[in-house]
Curated annotation (Swiss-Prot):
The lineage of its organism: Eukaryota, Metazoa, Chordata, Craniata, Vertebrata. Putative pheromone receptor. Disulfide bonds: none annotated. One of its GO terms (molecular function) is pheromone receptor activity. Residues 73-93, 192-208, 289-316, 368-395 are cytoplasmic. Pfam families: V1R. This is Vomeronasal type-1 receptor 2. InterPro entries: GPCR_Rhodpsn_7TM (IPR017452), Vmron_rcpt_1 (IPR004072). Keywords: Cell membrane, G-protein coupled receptor, Glycoprotein, Membrane, Pheromone response, Receptor, Transducer, Transmembrane, Transmembrane helix. Residues 33-51, 115-170, 230-267, 338-346 are extracellular. Glycans are attached at residues 239, 343. One of its GO terms (cellular component) is plasma membrane.
Amino acid sequence: MTHTLYPTPFALYPINISAAWHLGPLPVSCFVSNKYQCSLAFGATTGLRVLVVVVPQTQLSFLSSLCLVSLFLHSLVSAHGEKPTKPVGLDPTLFQVVVGILGNFSLLYYYMFLYFRGYKPRSTDLILRHLTVADSLVILSKRIPETMATFGLKHFDNYFGCKFLLYAHRVGRGVSIGSTCLLSVFQVITINPRNSRWAEMKVKAPTYIGLSNILCWAFHMLVNAIFPIYTTGKWSNNNITKKGDLGYCSAPLSDEVTKSVYAALTSFHDVLCLGLMLWASSSIVLVLYRHKQQVQHICRNNLYPNSSPGNRAIQSILALVSTFALCYALSFITYVYLALFDNSSWWLVNTAALIIACFPTISPFVLMCRDPSRSRLCSICCRRNRRFFHDFRKM
């Protein structure tokens, strides 16, 4: 029996394989080749190849899981008799999927950790939860099918799955924009002094956050409900700019009235949210500047004027909104160009898809870098991994 070896990059997060066995005619073996790398061997069989590995639950990291998913996708490609078009490790789509899922799932784990520990969440955390879920939805619905295309799986035959993924991508993208806008507007309300015209709204704003998040999801689910109606579950790499957002589904919008109404609603929402975010960011900077001028005579000799929790939270929101504005401005310009010129090349379509997924990929790391509590949780996880790595080397 011949075997094909697929090396896995477990150098940073080595795992201890506790068991591996055969399932009937599908031989699967796993072994540790050295202290820094684990390799999996798939039996050369016909049909679908199955990966079965048992790993201690307490020692399984996110990165290890993603590596196993990559191997499983690679085995699916081998079952179809196709090969990837380029090395997987150099593919920007796969890199974006790994980094984006790792960041967003880590942030979701952080919020779940606080919830089950009984900590009272901050008002902004409620918005960030929905933002993280929406970003994860964008990455899972758009980038993973494109990663499957990189592996050679170019036929998306599930009609319902095509509709669902296309619909989920549009809803996730809209909620991501709306949540970022809501976050910036809420922040500008909370940092204004109590004696300003925002005083009454400042008291009531936290009570409306939950309702605002629900309305945001409901609005985008209703607006995008017309989108799957015109979707066909066929893979099309040709003339993608006329058919839709995703390479694995085509969406010919033959009804010009429906197309115009949908385009008007989505464009109005995006422009409105972007305008509100720019206004909120400018207002935050102006309020901070005035506050700095007022207290400058009090803390003239302070060497760390930006080290307070309030300033760190505001800087985190500003960094997030700036990242959003940059990514979506570039993607908007790219998609306008694609809409105006029908003969756009395929690489430009891929570039536009890469840009639109930049914000869901980067945003969790922006939040974790600016918030010391999130960074502290990540450092605890890193210390546990280093302790396990030390024990692993003694084996």
